Swiss-Prot record:
GO terms for cellular component: Golgi apparatus; lysosome; melanosome; membrane raft; recycling endosome. This is Tripeptidyl-peptidase 1. It comes from Macaca fascicularis. Binds 1 Ca(2+) ion per subunit. Lysosomal serine protease with tripeptidyl-peptidase I activity. May act as a non-specific lysosomal peptidase which generates tripeptides from the breakdown products produced by lysosomal proteinases. Requires substrates with an unsubstituted N-terminus. Glycans are attached at residues 210, 222, 286, 313, 443.
């Protein structure tokens, strides 16, 4: 049947299931650990679905990202505005017409878009949604650390073939909330009586990374930073104030968040949210801080998509964003990964520095056709973000050199090819590492991560008015590195320079300048006879465990201040 026939009587064909296709045939629909089905949803219950509309001129967008992010380019630092991006990638008039006509025929109501017009979120009843998306069958689920309730479909959905050139995917059907890169470890035993610290605090971080009491924001520049929270994770201002009273006495700081974008609940504070806010604001001290709160409170919402749409709907944004969440690449559809990667590319074009935690499963492990392979995570594997790994002190209670934190995520993407900016560094690692795992375990030609690292082991956090020790994970290292980049942006802005923007092209050109090289330790992987639980190992220069290393702030400031 030809396209013209599919266009005729479009809604009737939806109902009959003819001329249809699956946008996400590879989307995993198995139930994640810790989630339980509560049965079919009421047909009259409402949910929201997000339709990702096909964008234009993505090759040109990629070229512009390279131009504004490469210090050797005459376009370096000349970032696009949101309006520039919208004009470039906005869906075609035909796409907008086709999708809106289809939704109107299905009875979708209360639809709203974003400035770029490439996401459309609509409210429908379960009955309408199942008619609109043949094959979908909505169920209630509960799970996650906060017993979150969601509505998802365990079955694949179909779209009319006529929409294939116009819709990338529909959000709110399959993907469960992303997982956090956060762990709480048992308190280590102190041997002997001399210890310089009993856990990582802002003063420990500032001493290790060579910050002085003067390394704080001015409080007057047009500089800001942000972190994103999901899974109904909330912070409390009272916890932040107590944290600063306990640990912020030797540097100027702000004791409250400047702005919350989204919904900030009034329930118990989450350790994840508390950690992110407290260490972003103590590392990036005295800098205006936003919190993006995308709880996914309504059962049909995907919180990560909510966050991306918030970025696409505001012209003036913080310069640095840190995110401590992710999923295994293989758990997500190709359509979803590619579209999210495009959204991250759009952020890079606008001069945003996006930092993602590398994860807390080492190289990861899963079985493919009966054989173990390492398991990369996304968005850590995106070529348009700076990914942060984790380290530990070589001597647990001394502020010493750092070694690999064995849970620090890292590896090679199975989706994205190696970007040109890291070609030299990764090729050198692959040719010189004495402890390389067998080639069948990883995709040596993929985007390699992390790019940098910071301490990730043994943090103190205040949550619900209680100081909590030994919180660990790349959820800790990511806001720390982000805060230090915000301090560098402060110097750049005050001297009339643009903010750093997408950091990786510059980072790899500078070959680790301004960073402490971490050369000892390996991270975890598959527990089998061939690799015996060992993934990749660190070494001189870049490696897929700690990237280029951890920040030496005065040297990193000098390296990144010019041009």
């Amino acid at each position: 049947m030809g396209l013209q026939a599919c266009l005729l009587g479009l809604f009737a064909l939806i109902l009959s299931g003819k001329c249809s296709y699956s946008p996400e045939p590879d989307q995993r629909r198995t139930l994640p650990p810790g989630w339980v089905s509560l049965g079919r949803a009421d047909p009259e219950e409402e949910l929201s679905l997000t339709f990702a509309l096909r964008q234009q001129n993505l090759e040109r967008l990629s070229e512009l990202v390279q131009a504004v992010s490469d210090p050797n380019s005459p376009q370096y630092g000349k970032y696009l505005t949101l309006e520039n991006v919208a004009d470039l990638v906005r869906p075609s008039p035909l796409t907008l017409h086709m999708v809106q006509k289809w939704l109107l025929a299905a009875g979708a109501q209360k639809c709203h878009s974003v400035i770029t017009q490439d996401f459309l979120t609509c409210w429908l009843s379960i009955r309408q949604a199942e008619l609109l998306l043949p094959g979908a069958e909505f169920h209630h689920y509960v799970g996650g650390p906060t017993e979150t309730h969601v509505v998802r479909s365990p079955r694949p959905y179909q779209l009319p073939q006529a929409l294939a050139p116009h819709v990338d995917f529909v959000g709110g059907l399959h993907r469960f909330p992303p997982t956090s890169s956060l762990r709480q470890r048992p308190e280590p035993q102190v041997t002997g009586t001399v210890g310089l610290h009993l856990g990582v605090t802002p003063s420990v971080i500032r001493k290790r990374y060579n910050l002085t009491s003067q390394d704080v924001g001015s409080g007057t520049s047009n500089n800001s930073q942000a972190c994103a929270q999901f899974l109904e994770q909330y912070f409390h201002d009272s916890d932040l104030a107590q944290f600063m009273r306990l640990f912020g006495g030797n540097f100027a700081h702000q004791a409250s968040v400047t702005r919350v974008v989204g919904q900030q609940g009034r329930g118990r504070a989450g350790i994840e949210a508390s950690l992110d806010v407290q260490y972003l604001m103590s590392a990036g001290a005295n800098i205006s801080t936003w919190v993006y709160s995308s709880p996914g409170r309504h059962e049909g919402q995907e919180p990560f998509l909510q966050w991306l749409m918030l970025l696409s709907n505001e012209s003036a944004l913080p310069h640095v964003h840190t995110v401590s969440y992710g999923d295994e690449e293989d758990s997500l559809s190709s359509a979803y990964i590619q579209r999210v990667n495009t959204e991250l590319m759009k952020a890079a074009a606008r001069g945003l520095t996006l930092l993602f935690a590398s994860g807390d499963s080492g190289a990861g492990c899963w079985s493919v056709s009966g054989r173990h392979q390492f398991r990369p995570t996304f968005p850590a594997s995106s070529p348009y973000v700076t990914t942060v790994g984790g380290t530990s002190f070589q001597e647990p209670f001394l502020i010493t050199n750092e070694i690999v934190d064995y849970i620090s995520g890292g590896g090679f993407s199975n989706v994205f090819p190696r970007p040109s900016y890291q070609e030299e560094a990764v090729a050198k690692f692959l040719s010189s590492s004495p402890h390389l795992p067998p080639s069948g375990y990883f995709n040596a030609s993929g985007r390699a991560y992390p790019d940098v690292a910071a301490l990730s082991d043994g943090y103190w956090v205040v949550s619900n008015r209680v100081p909590i020790p030994w919180v660990s994970g790349t959820s800790a290292s990511t806001p720390v590195f982000g805060g230090l980049l915000s301090l560098i942006n402060e110097h750049r802005i005050l001297s009339g320079r643009p903010p750093l923007g997408f950091l990786n092209p510059r980072l790899y050109q500078q070959h680790g300048a301004g960073l402490f090289d971490v050369t000892h330790g390996c991270h975890a992987s598959c527990l089998d006879e061939e690799v015996e639980g060992q993934g990749f190992c660190s070494g001189p220069g870049w490696d897929p465990v700690t990237g280029w290393g951890t920040p030496n702030f005065p040297a990193l400031l000098k390296t990144l201040l010019n041009p």
